[in-house]
Amino acid sequence: MADHSSSSSSLQKKPINTIEHKDTLGNDRDHKEALNSDNDNTSGLKINGVPIEDAREEVLLPGYLSKQYYKLYGLCFITYLCATMQGYDGALMGSIYTEDAYLKYYHLDINSSSGTGLVFSIFNVGQICGAFFVPLMDWKGRKPAILIGCLGVVIGAIISSLTTTKSALIGGRWFVAFFATIANAAAPTYCAEVAPAHLRGKVAGLYNTLWSVGSIVAAFSTYGTNKNFPNSSKAFKIPLYLQMMFPGLVCIFGWLIPESPRWLVGVGREEEAREFIIKYHLNGDRTHPLLDMEMAEIIESFHGTDLSNPLEMLDVRSLFRTRSDRYRAMLVILMAWFGQFSGNNVCSYYLPTMLRNVGMKSVSLNVLMNGVYSIVTWISSICGAFFIDKIGRREGFLGSISGAALALTGLSICTARYEKTKKKSASNGALVFIYLFGGIFSFAFTPMQSMYSTEVSTNLTRSKAQLLNFVVSGVAQFVNQFATPKAMKNIKYWFYVFYVFFDIFEFIVIYFFFVETKGRSLEELEVVFEAPNPRKASVDQAFLAQVRATLVQRNDVRVANAQNLKEQEPLKSDADHVEKLSEAESV
């Protein structure tokens, strides 16, 4: 049996800077050799008396249904409400743009890119503009960014509701989009940063499932007002007013949430971060073996950089500084584009037009079908959020996008068949494939769309990665929504065929480049991205075990050195006291 005490004591004598991040893990050529070398020295090490091989095992932490996490879930639920804003807007505009009262009120043409298309796409312009202010959440914190964003959406919703002209409506929608982007960037970042590694898939994944809740409320409120106030401005004005409901709730209850522990460490408030972890991760246990380890990992990840430093906060060059940074940025860009350009935006915003193209022309029926579509996607996304930590991110993406391509193939065939024959069976088949597409796509992409970009980013670049994410997704949505009315009118079902081939392209890219993040701490992922091939490293279990052992050893050294410093302080004071007594006696 190894002599644990001798191993620990030998490490305690080493200064903390003997294990350097770059020297140990930064050289691609010697990457695995360095990890193997570090791993050889980890035998017998403990953290607070717990062997390192057990330090990250979930046996030390309860499951997601444990009562100790209820407080954490309460915090996250408040931020989840931010996800409803884009879902509400998508279903709202997708429901009201076919209403005659709405089209006449604002003098719009349903197939006009400069009319209906512009009203839709201005939201994406506002999103792109708002994205450039996302890094400000590094300045004052995630919580203020969430609150300011939601307050801005409330004001924008009031403007949109009171307007009587198309220009004012467009302005109000830009205002909503601008501030919704700030809140929608800060909220998933907050969820990813406050969640323990073994729960992050569920905690952060559930965030975007409330996109469908906003969509459901918008669709059915529009359906209700359309039934009760036909041919009246109330049919679309009331849903426009209701757009402020969810962000208003965040403004009221958002003051109750504490700040993200990772942001607190990034601005030097380490004790507050430690208290957060003790309270929300470890059920108040100040002696838990993972406390010092988690804190040490977070502290090291910032490399002494002040997160709120204006020069650092606005410097987007950090997204592309190193090879691993560029790989991360590539994944953020791909995820942002794929999340909006897989055919899902067409279904979200233009479902009524899709239904009209297969013979379903009743406005109230189309609005109702829009609501049912939202329910289908919501249920599927919740299932995905709970399974994503079991099947993994890569398998989830690959399964969803391949299923989506098959569903769009079926939709293309049924739509083409209906155009030729006008048969009811073809129309019903198209409806089935629309819902199949929504359910399959939402299973993986909805819970992971906002989560994945935060997972693959570092603590230092997460806000800037969100900037990149929202700019790219905004451009993708703008292209989609501005071009879709014309495309659906002119090329009809061939528009769906285009997305079939694009989804196949996505499958290939995801298979060869996307990194698996399941179960890794955000700090462990930093090591994965430094590997010569991050995608291969992320699924190499032997490599990941070495990474974990290396990080645990590093943390053990830090803890030991910190304890030594604390022990030396009283000894020093005692020595001074004895020296003073000796001087007094000699006098």
UniProtKB/Swiss-Prot annotation:
Compositionally biased region (Basic and acidic residues): 19-35
Extent of Low complexity compositional bias: 1-10
Positions on the Extracellular side per record topology: 94-116, 165-167, 224-237, 352-370, 416-424, 492-493
UniProt key word Transmembrane: yes
Protein's membrane topology: Multi-pass membrane protein
Residues on Cytoplasmic side: 1-72, 138-143, 189-202, 259-330, 392-394, 446-470, 515-587
InterPro entries: MFS_dom, MFS_sugar_transport-like, MFS_Sugar_Transporters, MFS_trans_sf, Sugar/inositol_transpt, Sugar_transporter_CS
Family: Belongs to the major facilitator superfamily. Sugar transporter (TC 2.A.1.1) family.
Full protein name: Lactose permease
Lineage: Eukaryota, Fungi, Dikarya, Ascomycota, Saccharomycotina
